Swiss-Prot record:
Binds 2 manganese ions. One of its GO terms (molecular function) is phosphopentomutase activity. Belongs to the phosphopentomutase family. It holds the Pfam family Metalloenzyme. The gene is deoB. It catalyses: 2-deoxy-alpha-D-ribose 1-phosphate = 2-deoxy-D-ribose 5-phosphate; alpha-D-ribose 1-phosphate = D-ribose 5-phosphate. This is Phosphopentomutase. It comes from Streptococcus pyogenes serotype M28 (strain MGAS6180). GO terms for biological process: 2-deoxyribose 1-phosphate catabolic process; 5-phosphoribose 1-diphosphate biosynthetic process; metabolic compound salvage; nucleotide metabolic process. It comes from the Bacteria.
Length: 403
């Protein structure tokens, strides 16, 4: 019998809580990630008021320096810890796959100097459109359309760019290159990037609208991922008849593998929270696992190095946390975590190698405190033990600590 009939995992994308022990092996603009600290630096430089997460115990997580504006709680309502990544990457897919029990020992390919001509030429020949070569490098998704959107509107060329992540992204103005055409081009790009020397985690369609000086990316983004190289705990659950619900880009990250119910993409964090609440309210969802990704922290504020915007985004989530809890049942478990860091005060524009926080809450708890510090995959091991399925590759359950 399950200890919790339903478990709800919410990933606050990029909300790291301090440099990981191996941060010296990861870089931003040539600067090692050793001093990165997403939550710590936001709290220090922008001020951070998240009373609802603090009540669960966010401020109690062990750190060299306490979060400046997040108090510790003498009697928190939940259990907390921080988790370390073992996989060789700090990208979204690696983080989520490890959370679900995989150890990624061979990282995907990244292209710090842009994609080789062979790939670009193949995309041009397939699409019948030229590619803007000047955009072919690691680029902020908003900056690249600011810099080349006008040219694309005039010429119909494709904007192909990358980041420090193993991704190929194609941006296209919806009035110039229809979304369905963009999707077909991205599907082709996916087909030619499935093995080395260009093994990419994701191809991302990045549609946008607007006029020069006022371009906005739309919710028609679509990710073309590769399926995990072996079963994750999502597959174990689905195979055992335990329903799995994906909110936001979770379905894309796992390429649908192990997802029994895709609740759709998020237009924003707020929309994602709305969708999560609707999922919690589904009459047929009496037992199972929901998995939500809220990406605005990362996409809108981390990569843009905007600590004030990031702070406000955290405030928005914290303000709505009571709504999520109000729609949970007494025997539900809520787990709040992240997938990597993205310190908005740091060098460069890319992810940072950090610990991730873990907050656990249930109305059924009679205790509180610290969970032993562990690794990302401990989350999936806990979910697996609760529902009576095997773990994937790695992970140690902390279910017994939740009382």
């Amino acid at each position: 019998m399950s200890k919790f009939n339903r478990i709800h995992l919410v990933v606050l994308d990029s909300v790291g809580i301090g440099a990981a022990p191996d941060a010296d092996k990861f870089f931003n603009a040539g600067v090692a990630d050793t001093d990165s600290d997403t939550l710590g630096h936001i709290s220090e430089t922008a001020g951070l008021s998240v009373p609802n997460m603090a009540k669960i115990g966010l401020g109690n997580i062990s750190r060299p320096i306490p979060l400046k504006t997040v108090p510790t709680e003498d009697n928190p309502t939940g259990y907390v810890t921080k988790l370390e990544e073992v996989s060789l990457g700090k990208d979204t897919m690696t983080g989520h796959w490890e959370i679900m029990g995989l150890n990624i020992t061979e990282p995907f390919d990244t292209f710090w100097n842009g994609f080789p001509e062979e790939i670009l030429t193949k995309i041009e020949e397939f699409s019948g459109r030229k590619i803007i070569r000047e955009a072919n490098k690691p680029y902020s998704g908003t900056a690249v359309i600011d810099d080349f959107g006008s040219r694309q509107m005039e010429t119909g060329e494709l904007i192909v760019y990358t980041s420090a992540d193993p991704v190929l992204q194609i941006a296209a103005h919806e009035d110039i290159i229809p979304v369905e055409e963009l999707y077909k081009i991205c599907e082709y790009a996916r087909s030619i990037t499935l093995e080395r020397p260009a093994l990419l985690g994701r191809i991302i369609a990045r549609p946008y609208v607007g006029e020069p000086g006022n371009f906005t990316r739309t919710a028609n983004r679509h990710d073309y991922a590769v399926s995990p190289f072996q079963d994750t705990v999502l597959n174990k659950l689905a195979d055992a008849g335990v329903p799995t619900y994906a909110v936001g880009k979770i379905n894309d990250i796992f390429n649908g593998s192990g997802i029994t119910n895709d609740m759709g993409h998020n237009k924003s964090n707020s929309h994602g929270i709305d969708t999560l609440i609707k999922t919690l309210q589904l009459p047929e969802f009496t037992k199972g696992f929901s998995f939500t990704n809220l990406v605005d922290f990362d996409a809108n504020f981390g990569h843009r190095r905007d600590p004030e915007g990031y702070r406000d985004c955290l405030h928005e989530f914290d303000n709505r946390l009571p709504e999520i809890i109000a729609n949970m049942k007494e025997d539900d478990l809520l787990l709040i975590t992240a997938d990597h860091g993205n310190d908005p005060t740091y060098a460069g524009t890319d992810h940072t190698r950090e610990y991730i926080p873990l907050l656990a809450y249930s109305a059924s708890f009679t205790g509180n405190g610290l969970i032993p510090q562990g690794h990302f995959a401990d989350i999936s091991a806990t979910v697996a033990e609760n529902f009576g399925v095997d773990i994937a590759m790695i992970g140690e359950s902390f279910l017994g600590h939740l009382k």
